[in-house]
């Protein structure tokens, strides 16, 4: 069952997002120990694992998450999410329709990416537990990202739908979280701010501080 507090410190990562001197297992476990509230396995890029290699890694990371009672979300890959019985799935505007996904994931967390008012207007959010809004700031992690929309977009969506859980994404670090929180976001989702941090515990705790008041 979805709890909007899951969104507080939402870590997204794949093998291409971690430094060469670390494994994704090491990075994820450090983040889990520090207190991330949700994890999304996002295996993208030219060097992304596929097939059985991706399946094996997903199971290993899922097992890690469950040791810390943190839900494990799969990005885009519906068949993988079904095969490993993931806790949820996150899809974008160009991925499978949410209505169809909801038929398979009746008791799972469903997240959906929305970048602007046009996308919001044409999106059916009936089966969606939360939306990911962004990129808030310029981001190095997604080469196909939209133009940054700023924290103002979160405030706009919250005015339109106060009950809709929103997680901010894109270019977020510990120094630019405050405006996002002030805009009404339920949490922040980050990739490199955690995966490439020199001190993951300190970084995660700093993020957590913004949502513990």
UniProtKB/Swiss-Prot annotation:
GO terms for molecular function: magnesium ion binding; thiamine-phosphate diphosphorylase activity. GO terms for biological process: thiamine biosynthetic process; thiamine diphosphate biosynthetic process. Keywords: Magnesium, Metal-binding, Thiamine biosynthesis, Transferase. Mg(2+) binds at residues 76, 95. SUPFAM superfamilies: Thiamin phosphate synthase. 2-[(2R,5Z)-2-carboxy-4-methylthiazol-5(2H)-ylidene]ethyl phosphate binds at residues 139-141, 171, 191-192. Pathway: Cofactor biosynthesis; thiamine diphosphate biosynthesis; thiamine phosphate from 4-amino-2-methyl-5-diphosphomethylpyrimidine and 4-methyl-5-(2-phosphoethyl)-thiazole: step 1/1. The keyword Ligase does not apply. HAMAP family: TMP_synthase. This is Thiamine-phosphate synthase. It comes from Staphylococcus aureus (strain MRSA252).
